[in-house]
Curated annotation (Swiss-Prot):
Domain of life the protein comes from: Bacteria
Keyword terms of this UniProt record: Carbohydrate metabolism, Lyase, Magnesium, Metal-binding
Binding of substrate, residues: 54, 139, 279, 300, 329, 333, 356
Cross-referenced InterPro entries: D-mannonate_dehydratase-like (IPR034589), D-mannonate_dehydratase_GalD (IPR053379), DgoD-like (IPR034593), Enolase-like_C_sf (IPR036849), Enolase-like_N (IPR029017), Enolase_C-like (IPR029065), Mandel_Rmase/mucon_lact_enz_CS (IPR018110), Mandelate_racemase_C (IPR013342)
Protein name stated in the entry: D-mannonate dehydratase
E.C. code: 4.2.1.8
Cofactor: Mg(2+)
Residues at the catalytic site: 176, 229
Role noted for this protein: Catalyzes the dehydration of D-mannonate. Has no detectable activity with a panel of 70 other acid sugars (in vitro).
């Protein structure tokens, strides 16, 4: 990948040098929509943060532009904690995905600036390396079991040693996670939500057969993961977890809607399949009970939706006390800016488990030059000061915002379900 072009400077001792003089919101669509905040100090150092919220990008962009940017100008970029507290506590209507994604963009941009001022990569600021590379998992999918198995083989050839597997459900026209026409899977595909039809009994029938075949074809040398995408009741999720036990999954993700944390008590009582949840969480309060009661094995929050590095660090520390590991969301609905910051976090955090990783489009990689690299099943962050990702604004301007929304789901009788 091309290297970030932003210049660095020695650590600035003057508060005037650190004064924020500009903060701009950039919305671009190099294959999909991304929202980026770019902050500049008086000394000319810039930092970037991701604020992308899939299907609700302009809501976060407006929140940033109207509520946060005016309050950034004139502040000391080095006072990261104080700025985080100002925006979190100052928002009477606190938490929620829009607020926390906007705060995250500010927070990550400020950490990026701090790394550049110090001349240090972000992982060093956090406390240094805990590992040489972050284990990542890719996404293999197919219209049926055989096609998914072939895709798993292709991902193994690319070097992945952990792979999420999804397959089409017989009798269902469109299944979550299944790409069309050989293109990467992208659920936000139209200006208005598309409707999909779902059958839980059909799904519960095919998934165990999928993993039985994958173990037969690929053995025990790879880690296999699966995402139920919030579609099951607690007892249905418990049944699936039990049925998957012979195939030793790395985890079963988002088995049931996560609003009711106590629902996971039922799942936990019936299966030893490891559980992961949290990509829709926005704060520690969304998962406090899950972690305290050890109802999950992996927490899936993402830096961009959970208030940035400052808050996610607290969440990870809390999880470590209860032997819960990180497994951050990392699909292409987050920009390379978020991936870069997450990778530095993964390199440092002691209770790391795994990192989701989907390949961004060539257009997105060009708009967001970065220094992280994939080798032998792991992502390796670079040594560029900050988080190592920049934005090419001239190139970003060539890709204007395109309205796209996530689908909705109905059961076979027409009842609304959880997509």
């Amino acid at each position: 990948m091309s290297q970030p072009s932003d210049s660095t400077a020695p650590l600035q001792g003057s508060a005037r040098d650190r004064e924020i003089v500009e903060a701009r919101v950039i919305v671009t669509c190099p294959g999909r929509n991304f929202v980026t905040l770019k902050i500049r100090t008086r000394s000319g150092i810039t930092g970037v943060g991701d604020a992308t919220l899939n299907g609700r990008e302009l809501a976060v962009a407006a929140y940033l532009q109207e509520h946060l940017v005016p309050n950034l100008i004139g502040r000391d970029a080095g006072r990261i904690e104080d700025i985080w507290q100002f925006f979190y506590r100052g928002a009477y209507w606190r938490r929620g995905p829009v607020t926390m994604s906007a705060i995250a963009a500010v927070d990550v941009a400020l950490w990026d600036i701090l790394g550049k001022m110090a001349g240090m990569p972000l992982y060093q600021l956090l406390g240094g390396r805990s590992r040489e590379g972050a284990l990542v998992y890719g996404h293999a999918n197919g219209r049926d079991i055989a096609e998914t198995s072939d895709e798993v083989g292709r991902f193994r050839e690319m070097g992945f040693i952990a792979i999420r597997a999804q397959c089409g459900v017989p009798g269902i026209k469109k299944t979550y996670g299944i790409s069309v026409g050989g293109k990467p899977y992208e659920p936000a595909e139209s200006e208005l939500p598309t409707e999909t039809v779902w059958s839980t009994p059909r799904y519960l029938g095919v998934v165990p057969r999928l993993f039985e075949q994958l173990r037969a074809d690929h053995g025990d040398e790879i880690e296999l993961l699966h995402d139920a995408h919030h579609r099951l009741t607690p007892i249905e999720a418990a049944r699936l977890g039990r049925d998957l036990e012979p195939y030793r999954l790395f985890w079963l993700e988002d088995a049931t809607p996560a609003e009711n944390q106590r629902a996971f008590e039922i799942i936990r009582q019936h299966t030893v399949t490891p559980l992961a949840v949290g990509e829709v969480f926005n704060s520690i309060w969304d998962c406090k009970h899950l972690i305290e009661q050890q109802l999950i094995d992996y927490i899936r929050t993402t830096i961009v939706h959970a208030g940035g590095l400052t808050h996610v660090r607290r969440l990870a520390d809390f999880a470590a006390l209860h032997q819960v590991r990180t497994g951050f969301h990392g699909a292409t609905d987050l920009s390379p800016v978020c991936m870069g910051a997450a990778l530095h976090f993964d390199t440092w955090v002691p209770n790391f488990g795994i990192q989701e990783y989907m390949f961004h489009s060539d257009e997105a990689n060009a708009v967001f030059p970065h220094d992280y690299q994939f080798r032998a099943g792991r992502l390796h962050c670079g040594e560029t000061p900050g988080h190592g990702v920049d934005i090419d604004e001239a190139l970003a301007a060539r890709y204007p915002y395109t309205p796209k929304q996530l689908p909705i789901l109905r059961l076979e009788d027409g009842t609304m379900g959880d997509w």
